[in-house]
Amino acid sequence: PTRRSSDLLLELHFSLLYLYFIYADYDKAIKQLKFLEQFNLRQLKQDLFASVQLIKLIIHYELDNRNLLPHLIRSVYRSLNESARLFEFERVLIQFMRSDLPKVTGGIATARAFNKLLLQLTKIQNDQYEQAAFIMFDIVAWLRSKIEHKPLLTVISEIKPA
C-alpha cells in the first residue's frame, strides 16, 4: 500500500478508537489501540501517535486500572518526550495523571481536581503552538464529562449540536 492509503487506514482506525471512546465502549477501544500500536505511528503520523498515547492513558483510567497506570504514564511520557517535541498540553495532562490524580479520593475532590486541570488546559488551548494538540482529541469535553458527571457523548452533543 502507498503511504497515503496507509495514512487513511490509520486515520480510520483512530476514528473507530475515538468513537468507541466517546461511547464508553472501552473493550472495543482497547482492540483499536492494539491494532494501531502494531504500526510505527511515530514515523507515520506524529499527531496520531500522541493522541493514541493520551487516549490509552484515559481509557485505562476509565477502566480503573490503577495498578497499570503508573507504568503506562511513565511509558507514554518517555515515548512523547522522545518524539522531539512535547506539547505543554501533553506535559500538563501527564503530570496531572502522575501526581494529582492518585491523591484524589473521589466525589467532590475528583471534580475539583478535574476542574483545576480544565482551567490549566483552557489557558494552554489559546496558545497558537498548542492548538494543534487539541484538534485530534477533545480533552476539554472529556474533563467536562468528569466534572459534570455526564457521559462524554452527552457533553460532545451539547457542544456540537447536530
Name the predicted role of every residue range:
Residues 40-42, 81-82:
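Helix-capping and short linker residues that terminate individual alpha-solenoid repeat units
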Residues 43, 62-64:
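Short coil/turn linking the two alpha-helices of tandem helical-hairpin repeats
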